[in-house]
Amino acid sequence: MLKGSNQDGSFYIDCRMYLYIHPDNPQPRNIKTVVECLQDGGVIIYPTDTIYGLGCDIFKYKAVERICRIKNVDPLKAQLSFVCSDLSDLSKYTRSIGTPLYRLLKSYLPGPYTFILTASKLVPKILKSKKNTIGLRIPDNKICQTIVKEFGNPLLSASLPGEMVEEYTDPESIKDKFSALVDIIIDGGPGGMVASTVVDCTSEEPVLLRMGAGAWEES
């Protein structure tokens, strides 16, 4: 990795690389490399329990903007989600969770779900929708969970641009297409082809917005 300085005097780490991380036993040294990259405002591509996604520190505004440029979307209209390490972490970024909702979240997480919840004041404005909501995830993926826990901040979760999802199951294909656009591409084995199931929990009853990889039975 090469360290340099920006025009404003801040430092950055040039950590552009293709990094293999074992899906069941993530190597601490490689996790540390990813964490250092995120701390310095880097953008990564990482595995989840569904499809591979773009990620960065949610508190690094320029990194979030960079991901939006890669996806060619307006940051204020992108409806981006982010990954938390556990329910305790998730509760910091949403308003008070009542017992029924907590039980619901606990029964489905970790898992291939994105829950739309009312955002707390800790959520950066760039990530909030006009309705003051945010999509939150806790993927059932060891690499993703380890990165978020070691990093200490939530990780932005954004799908890769384009409609050819089958191309994004192979990390090598991802590298061929995106290596010049991001800082680290993590090879955590083959990815999935189906995105997460999205459920809106901002009303009294949960509402299914998108059926994805996670099973869901509406009451």
Regions found by a protein language model. Name each.
Residues D14-S219:
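Active-site-adjacent structural elements in enzyme catalytic cores
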Residues M1-R16:
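N-terminal amphipathic/basic-hydrophobic helices that include classical n-h-c signal peptides
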